[in-house]
Amino acid sequence: MSLIRTRKKIVSSAIASSLSMIATTAMAQEAVSQLPTIHTKATQEESLKVDQSANSKFVAPLLDTPKSVSVISKQLIEDTKVTTLADALRTVPGITLGAGEGGNPNGDRPFIRGYSSESSMYIDGIRNSTSQNREMFAVEQVEVTKGSASAMGGAGSVGGSINMISKVAKKGDFLEGSVAAGTDNYQRITLDGNKDFGNGIAARVAVLGHQNEKAGQSNGAEYKRVGIAPSITFGLDTPTRATLSYYYLQTDDKPDSGIPYWDSSLGKAQGKPAEVKQGTYYGWKDRDFQKQENHIGTIKLEHDLTDNITITNTAMYAKSKNDYVWTNPDDSKGNVGKGLVWHRLNSAITDSETFTDQLALTGKFDTGFLKHRFNVGAEYSKQKTDKGGYNIIDAKGNVSSTGFYSDCSDLSTNWCTSLNGPTQKPFVDRLQARPDFDATVESTSVYLLDNIEITPKWLLDLGLRWDKFEAEQNFLATSSAAAYTAKNNSDFVTYQAGITFKPTENGSIYTSYATSASPVGLNAGWGDNSETINANNQMIDPEEAQTFEIGTKWDFLDNHLNLTAAIFRTEKQNTRVQIDPTTYANVGESKVDGFELGLNGEITDKWNISAGYTYLDSELTKNGKSCRSGKCTDQSIYNGNQMPNVPKQAATLWTTYKVLPQLTVGAGAVYSDKVYGDVANTKWVPSYVRYDAMARYNVNKNVDLQLNINNLSDKRYFTKAYASHYATEAEGRSAVLAVNFKY
C-alpha cells in the first residue's frame, strides 16, 4: 500500500533529521556547558497561567480582553500527556465532543457553550476546519475563545473557536523529547529540537511516532500516527522576519464503532447505551479502516514599519485526505432488542485543498488622550473538495452503500453479530470507491479590531468585519437523480463591542456583545449534512447569533494566579430548519444561558492549579421538521427541550505539587452532567466523574521520569452521544511511563 510505503519514508526521514539535530545540539551544549542559565531553564516548570494570546487579533492582554478565553498551556499539555486535540479539550469545561460527519465519530467536532465549532478550528489564526483527528506533537498551546466571535475569525464561531499555536523556530538552542510506553500497547516518541545558527537564523523540527490500542478494549480499535513539522526563521531580532514551516501527519487506524442504545422493546432505560461489558467492540476489523493524511505549508513575512507598527502577511496551503470505512452499530430495525447488532457501513473519501492568505497591520498609536492597540487586515481563502465513499458489492453483484441483511435475517452472512459477545468474522464482499460530488468554497473579508484606552481605568474594545462568501457543490448523477449544481453567494457584517473597567491594575470588570454568522455551505464537502449546500437550501440567508457577556478577571498572588468569572447568553435566532421535504427557512431559534468560573496559575511556588466550572441552561426554543424519504415529522413538539451535546454542569481540575525538589505529583478530575444526543431528548449518556494522576521524578537536570494514570477507577462512561444508533464509550484505565529529556 502506498500509505505504508510513504510512512516508512517519513519515519526514516524523521529519524535521520532528529539524529542530525541531536548531534548538532549536543555538540553545541558541550561547547557552552559553562553557561548555567541554560541548565536552569532545562528543568524549570512553566506556569499553567497564560497572560497573552499568541493570536495577534487579541490586541490586548487577556486580563484586559472583554471575552472569555481558556488557554491550554504548554505545561498543562506536558503534565497530562494528552496526545490529541480531543483529549486536550477535555481539560476545558463547557466543551463537549460530538460525532462527526454522517455519524462518523472519528473527526474533531467540539461543541463550545452548546454550539458546534467544527467550522471554527484554526492553526495560528488561519481556519483549518476539515474533518480530521488533530495531534498535539507540534502544538505549543491551544486557545479556546468562547462566545460569538465572527468579527475576529469570520464565518461560524457561534459558541466559540479553537486556535492551535504551532511550534516554530525561535532564538536559542534546545533539544527535548519523550519516549513513552504503557498499557494497551502504548508506544510514543516525540522529539523537538531548535538550533540558533546566529545572524538571525534559527531552525526547528518536531517529530512524532505513535501507536496504541484503545484502553480497556480487547482486540478492538487501534491507532497509529507518524508526523514531522520542520520550520526555519530568518531575521530574528531584525525589523524584517520570515518564517517557513511545514506540517505532516499521517494516521492509520482501526476506528471504534461505539455502543448501540437500548430500545423500547427491551423494557430497559430506553435511549441509554446498552449495558454490555466495558470495552465491547462491534467494529468489523476485516473491513474497517481510517487513513488520514495532512500537509500544511506556511510562509509568514513580518516587517516593522516603525517601533509601534508591524505589517504581516501569512500564506498557508493545506492538503488533507480522510478515507474511512467504519461500522455504525445500527439499531434501526430492532436488532438490539433481539440481542444482535448490524454492521452498517459508513464511509467517506474526502480530498481537500485550501489556500489562505492573511494581510494584517498591527500596532499601537495615540489620538489625543486615547491610546489605541489595533489589528486591521484582509483575508482570502479558497477550498476545493472532492468527496465520495464506498459501495459494497456482494458475490451476486448486488450493490449497496450501507450493507446487506439489515434485519439480521441471515446470520450466516456475517453482517450481524451478537450484542453481548460480538465476534470477528471474515469480510467476503468487495468494496468499490465511488465519487459523489465536488465543492468549492471561497471567501474574502476585511476587518478592524481596536482596543482603546480612554483612561487607565476604562477600556473600549471594538471590532467590525465584512465577509463575502461563495459556495458551490456539483453533485454527480446517480441511479435515482440527475446531476445538478447548488450555489450560495452571500455577504454579511459582524461586529463586537466591549467595555472594561479596571478598578486596580490587576483586575478588570467587563461587559461585551458580539455577533456571528454562518452561511449555507460553510462546511461544503466535508462537514455535517445540515451545513452543506444543496438544491433545497441554497437560497437561505446566513444563520446569525449573538452573545451577551458580563465578567471579571483578576490576577492574585503577585500576578501568579488568575481568577475569571462570567455570565452570558448566546442566542441563535434564525437557524435553518426544514419546513417540508424540499423547503428550508430561517425560522429556528435556540439559546444558552450560562455561568462559568476559571482558576489558573500558581498558588505557591510549589503548587500549580488549573480548574474550571460551567453551568449551561440550553433550550431549543423553535424547531422545524425532520424530513426523510419525502416524509416529515413535526419537531415543534420538542420546543423547550435541552439542546443536544450540552451538559448542564461540567467541571475540570488539574493540580500539581512539588513535594520534594525532585518529585512532583499531580491529580485531576473531569465531571460532566447528563448529555442528550437528539432534540427529542430520548437518546442520552449519563453523567460521570473521571480521575487521573501523575508523578514526575527529576533524575537529573536533563532527564525526568513521568508516570500518568488516566481513569484511575476504570469508570465506564461515554464521551459522545449521537442523535441515533450509538454513543462513544471512553477509554478504560491506562498507564503510561515516559522518559522526558531537555537539553
From Swiss-Prot:
Tell me a Gene Ontology molecular-function term this record carries. Answer: porin activity
Q: Which NCBIfam families match?
A: TonB-siderophor
Signal peptide range: 1-28
Record keywords: Iron included?
yes
Q: What does this protein do?
A: Probably involved in the initial step of iron uptake by binding iron chelating siderophores, thereby allowing extraction of iron from the environment. May bind the siderophore, ferric enterobactin, with micromolar affinity.
Question: In which organism is this protein found?
Answer: Acinetobacter baumannii (strain ATCC 19606 / DSM 30007 / JCM 6841 / CCUG 19606 / CIP 70.34 / NBRC 109757 / NCIMB 12457 / NCTC 12156 / 81)
- Could you name the domain of life of the organism this protein comes from? Bacteria
Q: Which residues form a coiled coil?
A: none
Q: What is this protein called?
A: Probable TonB-dependent siderophore receptor PiuA
- Name the gene that codes for it: piuA
Q: Which Gene3D superfamilies match?
A: TonB-dependent receptor, beta-barrel domain, TonB-dependent receptor, plug domain
Its main subcellular localisation, reduced to a broad class, is: membrane
Annotated TBDR beta-barrel domain residues: 172-743
Q: How does it sit in the membrane?
A: Multi-pass membrane protein
